[in-house]
Amino acid sequence: MMTRLCADDPARLRAVLAGLRRYQAAPPAPPRTMRPEIARIGSVSLKDHGGSGPPVVVIPSLINPAHVLDLAPDNSLLAGLVARGLNPLLVDWGETAPLGIEQLIAERLVPVIAGLGQPVALAGYCLGGTLALAAAALLGPQVSRVALLATPWNFAGYDAARPRLADWWARTEPLATQLGVLPIELLQPAFWALDEAGVVAKYAR
């Protein structure tokens, strides 16, 4: 992809590859602080990130690990919520059993939130926002409000990427079927296909 998009600009390709090497050589993230688990249903758990204010159930994407919202003390959405007087409770999907989206919401997410037995706000990131909306509809008055962060809502906006996505899936589906899962290494190119120029620009900086 990078060589294709930079075919007419060797200097830009060199900059992109240099940026990619810097990314690959970056030091690993610091060890994460283990958070207490306050609820669990199957593979889905709630982790308490502290704070004494109103509870906010934070729902990450199914694709990213939960700690993407708590990368480091100085780079943490959850630490920011605590600093603002809230009590963030992070949903950790764990190694999710082979459930459909409807089952995951109705049999895992909704019961683990309902078990708190008190009104909560929901904050959903990316696909987690879509799941938060469904959970809020099922939980009714227990949910006081919903905040959505980077949640997809206009799926008609990717017409230019559809041929690339169709080609990616035609090559990926047989392997995913054989594995029984879709590993992130196979899924990542689908995200790249949505904005190839943006991926190149990120590494060219």
List the model feature ranges, each with a label:
Residues 1-29:
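N-terminal targeting or regulatory segments adjacent to alpha/beta-hydrolase or S9 domains
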Residues 123-128, 132:
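Gly/Ala-rich beta-loop-alpha elbow adjacent to hydrolase catalytic centers
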Residues 26-94:
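Short, surface-exposed "cap/lid" segments of acyl-processing enzymes
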Residues 91, 125, 149:
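The conserved SAM/SAH-binding core of class I Rossmann-like methyltransferase domains
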Residues 1, 117, 133-205:
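Alpha/beta-hydrolase-fold enzymes
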Residues 3-4, 49, 102, 120, ...:
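A structural boundary/capping signal
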Residues 89, 121, 145-147:
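A structural signal for isolated positions on well-ordered beta-strands in alpha/beta enzyme cores
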Residues 94-119:
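Catalytic nucleophile-loop/oxyanion-hole region of alpha/beta-hydrolase
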